[in-house]
Amino acid sequence: MGIIREIFGHDSKGENIYSYTITNESGMTIRVIELGAALQSVETADRNGKYADVVLGYDNVKQYETGNGENFGVVVGRNANRIKDAKFMIKGKEYRLAKNDGENNLHSGPDGFEKKLWKVSEISEDKNADGTVRLLRMREDRR
């Protein structure tokens, strides 16, 4: 059981992107990365004890940055799914969003949470529980 922090790669700005690998007492391992708070891999045993990665995830930072519209394991937002015509209304006020899926907005457009760098706010290795890595995303205007 434990948590390992290591450099996963570098983003297009040259910043280090870290991964955090957590292993429990049963040998199950998950890896999250700071870019998009992505769940990059989950390795667990099948009924025969053979371990395999059971989630889709990219192998490097560049693939997460470009993504080709695939949001493997990332946190999407501020909105998730499609917003028709890239606009919506709240209390009579119309809000317009970037069009990135034909005439629609998909998963917040080109600058959603999946493209943001999330920072670790807590790492906990409690011997009575599995490890915890807590990722935090603050709005730029609230730093």
Residue ranges and their predicted role:
Residues M1-R143:
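Surface-exposed acidic/polar loop and edge beta-strand patches at domain peripheries
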